Amino acid sequence: MTAMAEQALEAVRKSVTVSASPEEAFEIFTEDFDSWWPHTHHIGKAPMTKGIIEGRRGGRCYTEHEDGSEADWGTILAWEPPRHVLIAWQIAANWQFEPDLKKSSEVEIRFTPVENGKTRVDLEHRGFERMTAGVAEMRAAVGGEGGWGGLLELFAARVEHKARKGEA
């Protein structure tokens, strides 16, 4: 395998530390998903109105849209509040839903308590080798500026906003 091919398969890893307990961080990441996920990031055909993560193993990850449609983008593979969630990323390189879990990559999120009541959120997007085409493009998209790093910054901003407002 060439160095370029190996890099295309390498997992994307991002982390952020937030001023919240693991319970609060987990809840905001999952149950309050719509409050921080940008409505520009979806695979639906109409403008997005809401993002939803169903909190259970086998639960759907999907978006609702202005035309009444829903667009699935993932399935919960592991649900262990408040420490861990594993999601099948069912988006192919052409940004269409991939129904076959064997062809889907995975996003694992871990919530670890650290000093002063804070939580480190570690995200790993892996399994790109399962995708049938467009591996390098997908990895570049989720690892790039508009990918997981920027999304975790939005998540952290939401956590901080809730903490300032006393909502958390």
Each model region followed by its residue ranges:
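Short, solvent-exposed aromatic-acidic interface loops
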Residues: 90-94, 124-131
